[in-house]
Design a protein with these regions (language model features):
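Bacterial N-terminal signal peptides
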Residues: 9-17
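Bacterial N-terminal signal peptides that target proteins for export
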Residues: 1-9
Length: 160
């Protein structure tokens, strides 16, 4: 029981630390809409594999390009992985009110929508979306152990 309390306290401390890192979000067409960390029976990628995923939503009524943006993820303070969304792929242009799904599988060689990091639900997970000017666009922190397998952490409705 004490280990669980300590784990919860550490998770809360990490979330507070990440939330107070002083970066101000810029207004953007694109937002982090949904995150699924433990994918055992959910969407499959083009290779038939199930991995954690991050959904980015274009909340505007015009197309928005993710090329040059960055997805960042951290499971512990001071240790942030960064995935640079490549330029030159027409699929990074997200149509109005549509989604782009990124696989957090640590396999960027599989294509534009496969990140160089994996997510672990046993610790608090912070995910940030940065624009091509390296300004924070949106962020979310998923508390440790908050989700069961195949349960996503999402906005109440798209872009809400």
């Amino acid at each position: 029981m004490n280990k669980r309390r300590i784990g919860i306290l550490l998770s809360l401390a990490m979330m507070l630390g990440l939330a107070s890192c002083g970066e101000k979000e810029v207004n953007s067409k694109l937002v982090l809409n949904e995150v699924l960390i433990e994918n055992t029976d959910n969407f499959q990628d083009d290779y038939g594999l199930q991995s954690a995923w991050i959904e980015v939503f274009n909340k505007s009524y015009t197309s928005a390009d993710l090329a040059g943006y960055q997805l960042k993820m951290s499971n512990q303070a001071g240790d942030t992985a960064t995935y640079f969304i490549p330029k030159g792929d027409v699929l990074t242009m997200v149509k109005p009110r549509q989604h782009a799904l990124f696989w957090a599988d640590g396999q960027p060689n599989r294509g534009t929508f496969h990140t160089n990091f994996v997510m672990d639900g046993t610790t608090a997970t912070w995910v940030g979306l940065y624009d091509s000017g390296k300004k924070l666009v949106d962020q979310v922190t998923i508390p440790a152990g908050a989700l069961q397998a195949n349960q996503s952490y999402a906005r109440i409705s798209d872009a809400a």
